[in-house]
From Swiss-Prot:
Belongs to the peroxidase family. Classical plant (class III) peroxidase subfamily. Removal of H(2)O(2), oxidation of toxic reductants, biosynthesis and degradation of lignin, suberization, auxin catabolism, response to environmental stresses such as wounding, pathogen attack and oxidative stress. These functions might be dependent on each isozyme/isoform in each plant tissue. The modification Pyrrolidone carboxylic acid is found at residue 1. Its cofactor is Ca(2+); heme b. This is Peroxidase P7. PANTHER family: PEROXIDASE 52 (PTHR31388:SF24), PEROXIDASE 72-RELATED (PTHR31388).
C-alpha cells in the first residue's frame, strides 16, 4: 500500500525539507544520524512503523519512550519534531510523523556515507502507543543468536535481514550498562579491546552506567562495513553483536559483508525497505498528527 510517490503532488518539497533538517542536525552532531536510525527501528518493531515511539508520556498516557529499551537512550525526538514543523509550514496536515521518521532514517544513513534507497511512504500515525509492547518486542543487547533470529522473524525479517540491519552498528554509541557483562565476563573478545572498553565502564553495576563507547571502534561516524570486520576480530561491543560471528549459522553472512561493502550496502537498503513495510496504518486508519509528540 505504501508507494515512493505518495506525496509527490500533495507535498512536493517534502524530501528536500526532511533532508535539510537531517543534514543540519547530523553535521552539528554526527551521532544524531545513528540516533534517528535507531528511533525508526524501535518504532517499527512495536506495532509497526506508525510513529508511536514519538508520542510523549503525559499524566494520563504512558507511551514507549520510557520503556526499558528507550529510557535514557532514545534520542532525536527534537530533530524529528523540528522537521515536522517545517513540513507543516509547507504542507499543513498532509505528512505523517511516521513517514518523516522513515525518510529521516534514510537521510541519516546517506549523510554518514551509507547507501541510498527510495523510501516508501503513505503511513499514518498511531493514536496509541504501548510501553508493554516496547518492552517485549525490541531486541535486547543480551540476546542469543536464536533469540535475535526469532525476534526479527516475528516481524517478517529474515536472518540475513537481521545481520544486515545489525550492521547499523557501524555508527553510534552504546551505554556501559549494555556492554559491561561482555567486556568483563566473555571470552570470545579481543583482550586489548576488552581492556580498552573496561576503562570507561567500571565493573560495579550502577557505576558509570551511562558512559558511552562507539559500537564501531574504527569509524563510529562513517557508515561502512567495518562493523563486520570488527566482529571477525572479536571486537563486537555488545553480546548481540558478537553472536553474529561466533561459530554459528550467520558467520558466513558476516564474512561476506566483511569482504564486500557493496553486498552489505545493497542488503542493508533492501532490509530497511522491508522493515519500513512492517504493519503500516494506511487509508483511514490512524491520523496525520499536527505535532509528533501528541495525538490530535
Amino acid at each position: 500500500q505504501l508507494t515512493t510517490n505518495f506525496y509527490s503532488t500533495s507535498c512536493p518539497n517534502l524530501l528536500s525539507t526532511v533532508k535539510s533538517g537531517v543534514k543540519s542536525a547530523v553535521s552539528s552532531q554526527p551521532r544524531m544520524g545513528a540516533s534517528i536510525l535507531r528511533l525508526f527501528f524501535h518504532d517499527c518493531f512495536v506495532n509497526g512503523c506508525d510513529g508511536s515511539i514519538l508520542l510523549d508520556d503525559t499524566s494520563s498516557f504512558t507511551g514507549e519512550q520510557n520503556a526499558g529499551p528507550n529510557r535514557n537512550s532514545a534520542r532525536g525526538f527534537t530533530v524529528i519534531n523540528d522537521i515536522k514543523s517545517a513540513v507543516e509550514k509547507a504542507c499543513p496536515g498532509v505528512v505523517s510523523c511516521a513517514d518523516i521518521l522513515a525518510i529521516a532514517a534514510r537521510d541519516s544513513v546517506v549523510q554518514l556515507g551509507g547507501p541510498n534507497w527510495n523510501v516508501k511512504v503513505g503511513r499514518r500515525d498511531a493514536k496509541t502507543a504501548s510501553q508493554a509492547a516496547a518492552n517485549s518486542n525490541i531486541p535486547a543487547p543480551s540476546m542469543s543468536l536464536s533469540q535475535l533470529i526469532s525476534s526479527f522473524s516475528a516481524v517478517g525479517l529474515s536472518t540475513r535481514d537481521m545481520v544486515a540491519l545489525s550492521g547499523a552498528h557501524t555508527i553510534g554509541q552504546s551505554r556501559c550498562v549494555n556492554f559491561r557483562a561482555r567486556v568483563y565476563n566473555e571470552t570470545n573478545i579481543n583482550a586489548a579491546f576488552a581492556t580498552l572498553r573496561q576503562r570507561s565502564c567500571p565493573r560495579a553495576a550502577g557505576s558509570g552506567d551511562a558512559n558511552l563507547a562507539p559500537l564501531d571502534i574504527n569509524s563510529a561516524t562513517s557508515f561502512d562495513n567495518s562493523y563486520f570486520k570488527n566482529l571477525m576480530a572479536q571486537r563486537g561491543l555488545l553480546h548481540s553483536d558478537q553472536v553474529l560471528f561466533n561459530g554459528g549459522s550467520t558467520d558466513s553472512i558476516v564474512r561476506g559483508y566483511s569482504n564486500s561493502p557493496s553486498s552489505f550496502n545493497s542488503d542493508f537498503a533492501a532490509a530497511m525497505i522491508k522493515m519500513g513495510d512492517i504493519s503500516p496504518l494506511t487509508g483511514s486508519s490512524g491520523e496525520i498528527r499536527k505535532v509528533c509528540g501528541k495525538t490530535n
